[in-house]
A protein has these predicted regions:
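Active-site-proximal inter-transmembrane loops
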Residues: 153-161, 215-241, 246-248
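Non-catalytic, topology-defining segments of multipass membrane proteins
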Residues: 1-206, 211, 251-295
């Protein structure tokens, strides 16, 4: 079943949401990110095709299945349904990006939609491009992934014991994966399929937070600064069609025109053909350039 949906409004809280402490440098997060970037640079000097191929495959698994199809379109917006085992699988894939656990990720993104480019938005470029891209991650509490705090904004996931466990141990799948990569291909494999793949995926997601609220076209007259950015869409499995998404947040399809390449939508359609995806919400857009006021 595919359900057509029109432009949507998300209610905005009258009070700014204070989610995380913004004071002080988060040294743990900062050191980890610096080390990952050093590893990504080192990978360029230890290239081999096997490690590169594994990195590309894991990028699809982690960022494509885990973030775009999982954390974002499934867990956060519930734009389609899959069997519970597949929902769990997508969540585990999402942790491989080092973007946090599922409860944390969905909470942050739901708040972003509720307060998009307004006071309380966790990562708005109105506070600076650097802040929106990565700055908001580098400050505040030592433990960003506070399950109890995030449960307020992701109560549906917080009711599930598996999601609570995964949120508290979101680092574990990457530790296991790093060990496997070392056994399979040594240091080059760890640097490419680990460090380089993670860093590239982080920046792809961060560009959705920063670039797609600064550069690109606006098909819909949303109340925020969201844009459709083709080059961000290319590296993020269709997440760059961000203005479309903010106008229709529960649509499983983000690329609404034939020329807006949206790999995640194609994969969701494939799951439907295989009988694994149902209750799919799709934005119904009569005119490609119609302006509509939405979330």
């Amino acid at each position: 079943m595919v359900e057509d949906i029109g432009p949507q409004r998300i209610p905005v809280s009258k009070e700014p949401i204070v989610l995380l402490d913004r004071t002080g440098l988060n040294w743990i997060t900062t050191v980890i990110l610096v080390m990952l970037h050093i590893g990504a640079i080192a990978a360029l000097f230890m290239f081999n095709w096997k490690a590169f191929a594994v990195a590309v495959f894991l990028y699809w698994v982690a960022t494509g299945l885990g973030i775009s199809m999982g954390y974002h379109r499934l867990h956060t917006h519930r734009s389609y349904k899959v069997p519970l085992w597949m929902e769990y699988f997508f969540a585990v894939c999402g942790t491989l990006t080092l973007e946090g656990g599922p409860i944390f990720w969905t909470a942050i993104h739901r708040i972003h939609h509720q307060r998009s480019d307004q006071p309380g938005d966790p990562h708005s470029p109105r506070e600076g491009a650097w802040w929106a891209h990565v700055g908001w991650i580098l400050v505040g509490e030592t433990k960003h992934n506070n399950t109890r705090l995030m449960a307020k904004y992701s109560p549906d996931l917080a009711k599930d014991r598996f999601y609570v466990w995964l949120n508290n141990n979101h680092w574990l799948p990457n530790v296991v994966l790093a060990g496997v990569l070392w056994l399979v291909g040594g240091l080059p494999m760890v640097l490419w399929a680990g460090c380089f793949r993670i860093v590239f995926g982080l920046h792809a997601t961060w560009l959705v937070n920063s670039a797609t609220h600064m550069w690109g076209g606006r098909r819909f007259n949303t109340r925020d600064d969201s844009r459709n950015n083709w080059w961000v869409a290319l590296i993020s499995f269709g997440e760059g069609w961000h203005n479309n998404h903010h106008a229709h947040p529960t649509s499983a399809r983000h690329g609404l025109a034939w020329y807006e390449f949206d790999p995640s939508w194609l994969q969701i359609k494939l799951l439907k053909r295989l009988g694994l995806a149902k209750s799919i919400h799709v934005a119904s857009v009569k005119s490609a350039m119609a302006e509509r006021e939405a979330a």
